A protein has these predicted regions:
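Catalytic pocket-lining loop regions of alpha/beta-barrel enzymes
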Residues: 1-101
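Mid-to-C-terminal alpha-helical segments outside catalytic/metal-binding sites
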Residues: 96-100, 106-152
Length: 152
């Protein structure tokens, strides 16, 4: 959970942990993690808007380290997908094996304004370059990473 000013600060130094523990899988999440898809991200801004400048810390970590993944849950994951659709299409293609859908839905029916997950599913379906990539992000990557057996 990367959230500037609160949890796991110094995201720019996270690569040291990834190098030190190459056999441990890490799942990045939250406002600072997803804000840093943008190379010019201002760390104090929790939900940045507008076009993404390529080359952000998160993009580099996902590209360079096989033991890091990205959890798209909550408003921060949703914001990272919706703020620049052109960037998102390429990001989903580049990191199709490293991204994990998470609902962060805190209601019992799985819909409505409090359920960010329903909106995130819609964005993944809309912006994934292919059905294969969509399936990976929505469930196949998590199943593989967490070593879950498919249901019969």
């Amino acid at each position: 959970h990367f959230q500037h000013g609160k949890y796991n600060q110094k995201i720019h130094q996270f690569h040291r942990i990834l190098k030190k523990y190459p056999k441990v899988n890490f799942i990045g999440h939250a406002q600072t993690w997803w804000g840093n898809i943008d190379r010019n991200h201002q760390q104090a801004v929790m939900y940045p808007k507008g076009k993404v400048t390529p080359g952000g810390i998160t993009d580099r970590l996902l590209s360079e380290y096989p033991n890091v993944y990205g959890d798209l849950s909550a408003g921060s994951g949703n914001n990272s997908l919706s703020r620049d659709e052109e960037h998102t299409r390429g990001f989903l293609a580049r990191h199709q094996n490293k991204l994990l859908f998470g609902s962060d839905c805190n209601d019992t029916v799985g819909s409505g304004p409090r359920c960010v997950g329903a909106r995130t599913i819609g964005l993944i379906r809309k912006l994934s370059p292919s059905k294969s990539i969509e399936r990976k992000i929505l469930y196949e990557n998590a199943r593989q990473l967490l070593k879950l057996n498919p249901t019969s």
